[in-house]
Design a protein with these regions (language model features):
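Nuclease catalytic cores that cleave nucleic-acid phosphodiester bonds
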Residues: 2-151
């Protein structure tokens, strides 16, 4: 089992690394050339800046049982199909039971933005420490669940 992070502008990278280190799990951070990262713990893979390049690379190296951290519903759907686990930076788990609904909502929101001529209907609120704690707790639970299933 490894942890793969869609690390372009991901606010929970340090939390992922800290928790993964506690469990001795390898972490791979994926970013494009516009968001070059460095890490003392994680492997960093930098891909070209093409549209969705990081997403495609992440999907290609993901395996059954891996844990993926991404805010992209499309990536989540693809890795779930490969038997991996996926979690949003909010701590929400993507599952086979909720991903279809999430993709439909994304589609409807995109249609609404097009119809209104707006690029975004609303911005996300500023991240607070409670958000980080919620992510950490949810991520920890996912790791334990994945480890139990590996046994």
């Amino acid at each position: 089992m490894q942890i793969l992070v869609d690390a372009d502008a991901c606010p929970v990278v340090s939390i992922v690394e800290r928790v993964a280190k506690e469990h001795n799990l390898p972490v791979t951070l994926l970013c494009d050339t516009n968001h070059v990262l460095s890490s003392d713990y994680s492997e960093v893979i930098v891909v070209g800046a093409g549209a969705d390049a990081v997403d495609y690379k992440l999907i290609s190296i993901c395996h059954k049982g891996d844990i993926i951290v991404s805010q992209d519903y499309g990536v989540a759907a693809m890795v779930l199909g490969k038997g991996a686990y996926a979690i949003h930076q909010s701590g929400k788990w993507y599952t086979n039971e909720n991903i279809d609904q999430m993709l439909m909502e994304r589609h409807l929101n995109k249609k609404a933005r097009r119809a209104s001529g707006k690029k975004h209907l609303r911005g996300s609120r500023k991240r607070i420490s409670e958000d980080d704690e919620h992510f950490r707790e949810s991520f920890e639970k996912m790791i334990h669940m994945a480890m139990d299933k590996e046994k």
